Amino acid sequence: MRISIENVTNILNANRVGSRNAEIDWILTDSRSLCFAEETLFFALKSKRNDGHKYIPELYDRGVRNFVVSDLPKELEHYSDANFLQLANPLKGLQRLAEKYRARFDVPVVGITGSNGKTVVKEWLYQLLSPERIITRSPRSYNSQIGVPLSVWLMTERTELGIFEAGISEMGEMEALQSIIRPSIGILTNIGGAHQENFYSVTDKCMEKLALFKECDVVIYDADNEMISGCVSKSLFGAREIAWSRKDDDRPLYIEWIKKGEKTTTIRYRYLGMPNEYTIPFIDDASVENSLHCLAVALYMMLP
């Protein structure tokens, strides 16, 4: 779904230098990933270790003519047929553009967060659901402040379901990711020690992750984890909960038993009172937990 450079300029409220007509199909933050130069908009992002502005000459020589920058090139006359959209923070611009792009789509979107298991759950869900739907999902582990906008930009008019990861490393980061992903189905995989140094407590980290689900229709999590259950209660979601449990048979998804063999695990469950079972080719606890998250989504979406 193309977007004109004029529309991009307006969305970003940027200072535009250049008058070249352009239609944007691709956004880029890594010069090594360039594919279709004429249709690409490059965001020159700055970090502690790198500065995207230094790749502008190379990308220009390779055919890119549209750039989002905080600093204009010193030899601007060398780029007379290029567009430069200047704004104070290109990263915020990238997120803003992705947020507006996401708003074009009225399809179910699964948002996955947690300390571990995000990518596995995403890939398993893709395998479970893709025979029935055209799915856009995060590439690899694209779950950061940069990766999430790039992932959402992959949605097209053919997308019927989105599955995106969201990862955070400090307080306040989830708000931007939520506004980009805007999930209707939320999964909290678990809460562990990753990036704990940037949070006051594990509870604070859990509450920050749950901010991804503030507009969800349904939220899926492990009800046997008392800390997670307590945080969900504090969050006062208006969403329906599909909390799975091995202990509480009043939960929507009750796990009756789990039997592990040498190479497989069989799980017996009841969903809304209806019993069934399935077998996975894994015996580790993490895989069992990941499979239960996937099961809950499949049941919610009424798959057999």
Q: Model regions: which residues?
A:
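N-terminal leader/targeting and accessory segments in enzymes
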Residues: 1-96, 256, 283
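Acidic, Mg2+-coordinating active-site environments of NTP-dependent enzymes
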Residues: 73-79, 187-304
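Residues that form or flank phosphate/diphosphate-binding pockets in enzymes
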Residues: 37, 50-54, 120, 146, ...
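Conserved beta-strand segments of alpha/beta enzyme cores
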Residues: 15, 83, 134, 240-242, ...
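Phosphate-binding loop of NTP-binding sites
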Residues: 12, 92-240, 298-301
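ATP-dependent carboxylate-amine ligase
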Residues: 1-16, 36-41, 136, 210, ...
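Thr-Gly-centered strand-to-loop micro-motif
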Residues: 43-46, 137-139, 164-165, 280-281, ...
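Structural signal for conserved beta-strand scaffold positions within catalytic alpha/beta enzyme cores
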Residues: 29, 44, 69, 86-87, ...
